[in-house]
């Protein structure tokens, strides 16, 4: 294996590792941002796309698990801090930390509940962005 093949292998490796930058450029690197969409627009996309629609719907429903986990975690750890510490700054910090931990645990529960590990979450979001861009531009075929 020569140096040229080695360099090409390294380029391919890092191109794969930084492929998420294409997503961020498409979503955030715009001269003129896309207008806000509503829940009705998202529901229209879910109904119109048989592949990515159900995936996007499951991802939207999984937010409830993260929110529930954040509420439970924040209330639990904040309550324990209030019971034993009674220091206001400790209660605030414990509530915040409990909410973060609860949201992470809730997200993991949702990941398995909806089997999101089998889906292409970035692809579904990007497909929705493409669809919304076409709809805003007036190129929607439905």
Curated annotation (Swiss-Prot):
Membrane topology category: Peripheral membrane protein
A Pfam entry, by short name: Rick_17kDa_Anti
GO cellular component: mitochondrial inner membrane; outer membrane; respiratory chain complex II (succinate dehydrogenase)
UniProt superkingdom: Eukaryota
Keyword Amino-acid biosynthesis part of the UniProt annotation: no
Mitochondrion found in the keyword field: yes
Cell compartments where the protein resides: Mitochondrion inner membrane
InterPro entries referenced in this protein's UniProt entry, alphabetically: Gly_zipper_2TM_dom, SDH6
Pathway: Carbohydrate metabolism; tricarboxylic acid cycle
GO biological processes: tricarboxylic acid cycle
Keywords for the protein's UniProt record, in alphabetical order: Membrane, Mitochondrion, Mitochondrion inner membrane, Tricarboxylic acid cycle
PANTHER family: SUCCINATE DEHYDROGENASE SUBUNIT 6, MITOCHONDRIAL (PTHR36708:SF1)
Subunit structure: Component of complex II composed of eight subunits in plants: four classical SDH subunits SDH1, SDH2, SDH3 and SDH4 (a flavoprotein (FP), an iron-sulfur protein (IP), and a cytochrome b composed of a large and a small subunit.), as well as four subunits unknown in mitochondria from bacteria and heterotrophic eukaryotes.
Protein name stated in the entry: Succinate dehydrogenase subunit 6, mitochondrial
